[in-house]
Every structure is written in structure tokens, then in C-alpha cells.
């Protein structure tokens, strides 16, 4: 559009009247604020879990290089079960090792379910805000009429803000869930691998 043309003045006025990001955010209303709060919580939760799992992973890697099982890391606690039960049969040891791995699972997977729920609920909250905003817009049209297309378009635009916010929360949360889950599963794989190896060694020794 040519700013110097016949419609240039209207175009420039539209640019000037374009809401800022903060104003757009406020247009989302209470639902928008709730979505933002949920998103901030998901981000903080994911960061905390990544830090915790990184520390656990470092401790597990250190345990792999150590000949002495220590109770300050998940793998060490699993290995201690074998050391504390040197004379039990292979089947019982396998059950005890599986139980030890299961005891560590909740600590490793903590927060994953919550992140998944937030990723699913955020778009629905956005849709709720949009539907509510559309209802308010059409109620206003019913009362005041549709004589001003700009007002109608502005109301619809404001209603759609919550959908955008919901997606802006859901998409990063899905990615964060994938990262956190990947780190947790990596540690779980090491625990299962080491537990299976110990049971296999015990079974081989018993066979000899």
C-alpha cells in the first residue's frame, strides 16, 4: 500500500493503532493470564527437572566408573541390592533388582505427567477464552448492531489472542517434555542394563 495514496492515511492510522505485544497479552483477559501462569510454571518445572536429571546422570556415570556402590545415586542403590544379598538364588535376585529399579522410577519420571497435562490443557484453555470472547463479541453486536465492522473485527481479534497464547505454551511444553523424558529414559536404560547384567552374572556363576 502506498502511504501517499488515497488510502495511505487510513493505512498509517491502522499501523499507529496496532496494539503492542503487552496490549495484546492484556486482551486475553483472565484466561490469558491463567495460560501465561501455567506456561511459566511448566517452564520452571522443566528447568528444575533438567537440572536434577543432569545431576543424577553425572552421579550415575560416576558410579559406572567406581567399583564401590554408593547410596547417593540411583545406580548405586540398585547395585547395593546385589551386594546386600550375595547368597540368594537368581530368581529372587532378579525380583529384588526389578523392585529396586521400580523404586527409582518415580524419582526419575517426576514432573513428566504434569508437563504432558499442561501441554494438552493449554490449547483447550485458549479455545475456552476464544469461545468466551466470541460470545461477548456477538452479544455486543446483538445489542449495538453490526454498523461498525472495525469494532466487530477488533472483538474477534481479541478473542483469538487466547488461542495464540495456548499454542505458545503448548508447543514449547511438548518440546520440554521430550527433553526431560529423554534424560529420564537414558538413566532408566542404564539402571535396567546394569541390573540385567548383574542377574546374568549371578546366573552364570550359579551354573558353574
Say what each PLM segment does:
Residues 29, 43, 79, 126, ...:
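Residue-level signature of catalytic and energy-coupling elements of molecular machines
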Amino acid at each position: 500500500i502506498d502511504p501517499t495514496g488515497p488510502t495511505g492515511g487510513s493505512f498509517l492510522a491502522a499501523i499507529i493503532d496496532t496494539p503492542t505485544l503487552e496490549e495484546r497479552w492484556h486482551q486475553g483477559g483472565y484466561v490469558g493470564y491463567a495460560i501465561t501462569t501455567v506456561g511459566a510454571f511448566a517452564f520452571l518445572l522443566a528447568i528444575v527437572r533438567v537440572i536434577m536429571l543432569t545431576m543424577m546422570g553425572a552421579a550415575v556415570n560416576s558410579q559406572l566408573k567406581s567399583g564401590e556402590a554408593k547410596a547417593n545415586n540411583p545406580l548405586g542403590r540398585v547395585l547395593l541390592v546385589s551386594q546386600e544379598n550375595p547368597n540368594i538364588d537368581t530368581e529372587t535376585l532378579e525380583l529384588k533388582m526389578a523392585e529396586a529399579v521400580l523404586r527409582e522410577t518415580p524419582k526419575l519420571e517426576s514432573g513428566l505427567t504434569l508437563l504432558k497435562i499442561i501441554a494438552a490443557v493449554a490449547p483447550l484453555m485458549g479455545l475456552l477464552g476464544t469461545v468466551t470472547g466470541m460470545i461477548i463479541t456477538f452479544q455486543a453486536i446483538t445489542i449495538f448492531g453490526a454498523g461498525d465492522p472495525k469494532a466487530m473485527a477488533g472483538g474477534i481479534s481479541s478473542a483469538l489472542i487466547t488461542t495464540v497464547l495456548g499454542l505458545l505454551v503448548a508447543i514449547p511444553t511438548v518440546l520440554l517434555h521430550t527433553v526431560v523424558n529423554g534424560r529420564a529414559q537414558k538413566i532408566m536404560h542404564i539402571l535396567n542394563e546394569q541390573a540385567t547384567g548383574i542377574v546374568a552374572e549371578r546366573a552364570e556363576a550359579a551354573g558353574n
